[in-house]
C-alpha cells in the first residue's frame, strides 16, 4: 500500500542539527515538514471533494431510478383502468342488447296476440307487418353484431398500441441508463488517472529531494574530515553556507507551496468542469 504523506515525510532522513562545509547544509526539517503537512491537507480536501461528488452521482442515480419506477407504475395503472373501462362498456352493451331483444320479442308477441283477435280479413296485413318487423329485428341484430366486432377490433388495436408504447419507453430508459453508466465510468477513470499523475509527480519530487540530501550529507562528511582549517575561516564559511542554505530552503518552500496551490486549483477546476458537464447532460 502507498504510505500516507505524513508517513513519507516522517521517514525521510534529515539531519537534526546544521553541519558546516556545504552550500546545502542547515536545518530544513521544520520547513519541509510544514510544507508536506499543508500538501497532505490539501490532497485530503481534494479527496473529500471527489468522495462528495461520487455520493452526489449515486444519489442522483437512485432518484432517477425511483422516478422511472413511478412513471412505469403510473402507466401500468392507466392501462388497468382502461381495461376495466372497456370491460364495463362491453358488459353494458351486452345488457342493452339483451334488453332490446326482450323488448322487441315482447312487442312481437303482443302484436301476434292482437292479430289473433282481429278479423280474418286483417290477418294478411298483420302477417305482413310481423314479417317486416322480423326483418327489421334481423337487420338490427346484424348491425349490433357488426358493431360489437368493430368495437372488439378497436380495443385490440388500442391495447397493441399501448403495449408497443410501453416497450418503447422501457427500451429508451434502458438505453439512457446504459449511456449514463458509460459516461460515469469514463469520468471516474479520468479522475483516477489525474490522481495517479499527481501522486507520481510527488514521488518523483521525493526521490529528487532524497538525492540532494544524500549529496549534502557526503559533503558535510568531507568537511568534517578537513578540521585542519583555521577557526576563523571555518566559522566564516559555516555562517555563509548556513545563510545560503536558509535562502535556498525558503525559495524551495515557496516554490513547493506555489506548485501545490497550482495542483489543487487545477483539480478543483477540473472537478467543477465535470460537475457542469454532468449538470448539462442531466438537464438535456
From Swiss-Prot:
Q: Give the residue ranges for region: Disordered.
A: 1-30
Question: From what organism does this protein derive?
Answer: Spermatozopsis similis (Green alga)
One Pfam family assigned to this protein is SF-assemblin
Q: What does this protein do?
A: Major component of the striated microtubule-associated fibers (SMAFs; system-I-fibers).
Q: Where is this region: Nonhelical region?
A: 1-38
The primary location reported for this protein is cytoplasm
Q: Which domain of life is it from?
A: Eukaryota
Q: Which GO terms describe its cellular component?
A: cytoplasm; microtubule
Recorded hits in InterPro entries, A to Z, give: SF_assemblin/giardin_b (IPR008374)
Q: Name one GO molecular function term.
A: structural constituent of cytoskeleton
Query: Which keywords label this protein?
Result: Coiled coil, Cytoplasm, Cytoskeleton, Microtubule, Phosphoprotein
Location in the cell reads: Cytoplasm, Cytoskeleton
Q: Where is this region: Rod?
A: 39-284
Question: In what ranges is there compositional bias, type Low complexity?
Answer: 17-30
> Which residues lie in coiled coils?
56-102, 239-268
Under which name does UniProt file this protein? SF-assemblin
Q: What is known of its domains?
A: Consists of a small non-helical N-terminal domain and a rod domain with a 29 residue repeat pattern based on four heptads followed by a skip residue. This alpha-helical protein is characterized by the ability to form a special segmented coiled coil and to assemble into striated fibers of 2 nm protofilaments.
- State the post-translational modifications: Consists of at least four isoforms including two phosphorylated.
Q: Its family?
A: Belongs to the SF-assemblin family.
Amino acid at each position: 500500500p502507498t504510505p500516507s504523506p505524513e508517513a513519507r515525510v516522517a521517514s525521510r532522513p534529515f539531519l537534526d542539527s546544521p553541519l558546516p562545509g556545504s552550500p546545502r547544509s542547515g536545518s530544513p526539517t521544520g520547513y519541509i515538514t510544514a510544507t508536506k503537512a499543508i500538501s497532505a491537507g490539501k490532497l485530503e480536501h481534494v479527496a473529500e471533494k471527489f468522495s462528495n461528488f461520487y455520493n452526489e452521482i449515486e444519489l442522483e442515480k437512485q432518484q432517477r431510478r425511483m422516478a422511472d419506477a413511478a412513471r412505469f407504475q403510473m402507466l401500468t395503472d392507466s392501462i388497468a383502468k382502461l381495461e376495466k373501462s372497456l370491460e364495463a362498456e362491453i358488459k353494458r352493451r351486452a345488457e342493452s342488447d339483451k334488453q332490446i331483444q326482450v323488448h322487441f320479442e315482447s312487442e312481437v308477441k303482443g302484436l301476434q296476440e292482437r292479430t289473433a283477435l282481429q278479423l280474418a280479413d286483417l290477418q294478411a296485413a298483420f302477417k305482413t307487418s310481423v314479417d317486416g318487423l322480423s326483418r327489421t329485428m334481423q337487420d338490427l341484430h346484424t348491425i349490433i353484431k357488426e358493431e360489437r366486432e368493430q368495437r372488439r377490433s378497436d380495443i385490440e388495436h388500442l391495447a397493441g398500441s399501448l403495449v408497443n408504447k410501453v416497450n418503447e419507453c422501457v427500451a429508451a430508459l434502458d438505453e439512457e441508463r446504459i449511456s449514463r453508466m458509460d459516461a460515469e465510468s469514463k469520468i471516474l477513470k479520468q479522475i483516477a488517472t489525474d490522481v495517479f499523475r499527481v501522486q507520481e509527480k510527488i514521488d518523483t519530487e521525493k526521490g529528487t529531494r532524497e538525492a540532494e540530501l544524500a549529496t549534502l550529507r557526503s559533503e558535510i562528511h568531507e568537511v568534517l574530515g578537513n578540521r585542519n582549517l583555521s577557526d576563523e575561516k571555518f566559522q566564516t564559511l559555516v555562517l555563509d553556507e548556513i545563510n545560503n542554505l536558509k535562502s535556498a530552503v525558503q525559495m524551495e518552500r515557496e516554490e513547493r507551496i506555489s506548485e501545490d496551490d497550482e495542483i489543487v486549483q487545477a483539480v478543483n477546476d477540473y472537478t467543477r468542469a465535470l460537475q457542469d458537464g454532468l449538470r448539462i447532460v442531466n438537464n438535456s
